Amino acid sequence: MNSNWQKFISINPDIRFGKPTIVGTRICVSDILSWLASGMSFEEICLDFPELNKEHILAALAFAANRENITKIVAA
């Protein structure tokens, strides 16, 4: 999985209320995760949102995985 997600994900309070987004877009990590969960393929997402590519989707997954690990550490 993409370990360099930091170069693709930004958090800015002025964009989408501070939700993590793909740099240069208003597309949230949670949007990408929802599309994947609904059954969309990487290719379908990239066709529907040409500003995204496979690296962006992998970065969103890596960000979510990293966030899950942080939550586990804090909860422990």
Predicted regions and their residues:
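A generic structural signal for short, solvent-exposed coil/turn residues
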Residues: 1-3, 46
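Long, charge-rich, low-complexity alpha-helical segments
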Residues: 28-76
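A short, structured beta-strand/loop element
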Residues: 3-40
